Amino acid sequence: MTTTQRTQTPSLDYWIHDADQHYYEPDDCYSRHIEERFKKKTMWIDRSNPDTPGRMYVGDERCQFFSVGAGDNIGAPGMMKAFLQGATEEGGSPSLNPINGLSVPEFVDAKARLARMDEQRVESSLMLPTTGVGIEPQLRAPKHREALYPSVRAFNRWLEEDWGYGQDGRIFGAPMLTLVDLDEAVVELERLIKAGARFLVLTTGPVDGRAPGDPYFDPFWSRVEEAGLNIVFHIGNTPFGEMYSKPWGLRPAPPSHRHSLMEYFLAFTERPVMDTVVSLIADNLFGRFPKLRVLSIEYGSGW
């Protein structure tokens, strides 16, 4: 028996909806709209050495999840095949012969992305953070916490300005929020609802010793349900390293591309979302708010 190798990209007779697209954020995604006194307390990128990728900081501390600018040094489209075949740089990164994502128009510009979506027959896309999924847990630390909500608000205003929340019916930017301070969270939630947000990204895991489905947070969940927002849990930085990796003698906050096997298992992929979803169910969140919708994205499905 012989097989015929496909020489063309398979085509569909309909356009698709893509629920996991990303942009690469500009350096000022946190600082553009933040109050002046927080500009050096939020996420910023040191580009004093033009010969190396930018070094990411949260305040005066190196960013834990991304050591360099998230878009500075990435694998080119199609590199995952080489990664799976072992054709990678030392250390196993899929970034062999990397490119700068910030230099690719459709990675950073909504109009260019729409043109690419038209070319690829993508009707609409859920547009998610890249840098954004790695910052919030570090900002929870006591030394950074005063900049947490100013940073979240500033990021959301940048997103609203550069990508939008889906008013065009095609690119649905998903703002971020944190439940660390319930009152602050509800205030920003109301602003996002008025601005037209349809999706909302939260970090998996507990919040300062409370389960996210604790009735304490019901004022937040009630408004989310009433407004019809969709909650998104996307793989990224979480509190799980501190909770589970550290007691095993492992690093609580390794860089995203340098997890050991055990760190990966305990704190990075399926464990955070599995524990979070089980917690929401066990706390009867969906019994109290049956119209809530939650998306688990890039967290696997083996669980």
Report each predicted region and the residues it spans:
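Helix-coil boundary/capping segments in enzymes
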Residues: 1-303
